[in-house]
A protein has these predicted regions:
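Hydrophobic alpha-helical interaction segments
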Residues: 112-154
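Phosphate/anion-contacting hairpin/loop surfaces
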Residues: 10
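GHKL/Histidine-kinase-like ATPase module
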Residues: 4-7, 16-120, 152-194, 203-204, ...
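Charge-rich (often acidic), low-complexity intrinsically disordered regions concentrated
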Residues: 41, 144-403
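Short, conserved catalytic or adaptor-binding loops enriched in Gly and charged residues
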Residues: 13
């Protein structure tokens, strides 16, 4: 064994050793030893140091086990945040001759985990009595992993991990189009939750439509993420929107038309706005289109205030059979849908032309000029002429357009 390997092995072996160890005249670190400065507690299996109890730092589920100061078991993880357990050598024994494995290891580790869980629970009960509610719920991840969420049942503050806010237009695929939900920035009190209202939604937007999400977004409701104990007080406040009948009615609907893109084919209903009813509550939306879902009307409602193609992000994820996002198809369908909306909502042909024309800021030669544009029966330019038309110009430009 090379000197470097010897040194690294010794450093690992002496971390929990009960007496100082010198190697090459250097004192080796014993940070996991009983006299290494950590705060240990006595238990039925030995002494335990609980890591991560001073301030929240994740679930804290990894641990190292020592017997007579030597490492004898470690849970599988690369994290350095670990609980330390020194087993009572009168009750537990190592297998000879190497003494690097426990006798009846599986049974011993099962008991170690049980006692570790009990010790963590006892510590949290003590902390609950001394910490503020906001500080205590900061340990949510660790409480959840150790199945101790019941300790939050009577705490008048909800951890942000249990709630979501709708911050953007709801879409059917958040991996492709981005998240429209996020955690609140801080824990929320009972009063804050009651003021805003909290709901649960169990809809797949592509299948069930975006109606309930748009309703909740319009009302600025909080979304319950369903992660607290069944006995938590928040369950008495959560309004389950899927338990209520969803009705969407248009306001001053003008007409319907069929959109035929490369990916999306769908009936589109044009209107001034639409109302979303859930129970006796209603919201009216005039600036966000809504897809009603494949299991419902399977159509799109476009109010007057939305001239975008964002609603296609509710209808389709534009993923191929190989789960790859088809960006070019998405962009072409989006451009086509915008033109489709303009064609169906423009007040007159000139208004439609103005809304459909691109930006010519990169062509200084066109600045201040006027043109006569003729479209063919498919809506494509048949001829473009400078205005006023000069003699012979029509034939020249028309020939150019056809070449």
């Amino acid at each position: 064994m090379e000197m470097g390997q010897i040194a690294s092995t010794l450093k690992r072996l002496v971390l929990g050793f009960p007496i100082p160890v010198l190697f090459n005249e250097q004192l080796l670190e014993r940070s996991c030893a009983l006299d290494g400065g950590l705060s240990f507690v006595n238990t039925e299996i030995g002494t335990i140091y609980l890591h991560g109890m001073d301030q929240p730092n994740g679930a804290q589920y990894e641990f190292d086990v020592y017997l007579q100061g030597l490492p004898i078991y470690t849970s599988h993880s690369y994290t350095s945040h670990r609980h330390i357990i020194h087993l009572d050598s009168c009750r537990f024994h190592a297998r000879l001759p190497d003494r690097d494995k426990l006798v009846d290891e599986a049974d011993v580790i099962k008991r170690v985990k049980a006692v570790l869980a009990q010790t963590i629970e006892q510590r949290f009960i003590q902390m609950k009595a001394t910490l503020s509610a906001e500080a205590f719920v900061g340990f949510y991840e660790m409480l959840r992993h150790w199945e101790l969420l019941k300790l939050l049942n009577d705490v008048p503050v909800v951890p942000p991990e249990a709630l979501r806010e709708i911050i953007a237009y709801p879409v059917c695929d958040t991996e492709v189009f981005g998240n429209f939900e996020q955690r609140p920035e801080k824990a929320m009190t009972l009063e804050e939750i009651m003021d805003r209202g909290v709901v649960s939604i169990d809809d797949d937007i592509k299948q069930d439509g975006a109606g309930r999400y748009l309703f909740a977004w319009s009302r600025d409701y909080l979304l319950y993420h369903g992660t607290l104990d069944n006995g938590h007080w928040i369950h008495t406040l959560v309004r389950h929107l899927n338990d209520e009948e969803l009705v969407i009615e248009t306001v001053n609907e003008s007409h319907q038309a069929q959109f035929q893109g490369d990916w999306c084919w769908v009936v589109v209903r044009f209107c001034e706005g639409y109302r979303i009813w859930l129970g006796r509550d209603v919201v009216e939306i005039r600036d966000q289109a809504c897809y009603q879902g494949q299991e419902n009307a399977d159509d799109i409602i476009v109010p007057k205030g939305d001239c975008s193609a964002q609603v296609l992000q509710q209808m389709a994820s534009f993923r191929s059979e190989y789960d790859e996002f088809q960006e070019s198809t998405f962009e072409s369908d989006s451009d086509a849908f915008i033109a489709f909306v303009v064609a169906n909502t423009a007040s007159d042909p000139a208004n439609a032309m103005q809304r459909l024309l691109p930006d010519f800021c990169g062509c200084p030669a066109l600045y201040g000029k006027a043109f006569v544009v003729e479209l063919d029966q498919q809506g494509k330019p048949a001829s473009v002429m400078a205005y006023p038309v000069q003699s012979g110009q029509t034939q020249t430009l028309e020939a150019g357009m056809g070449s």
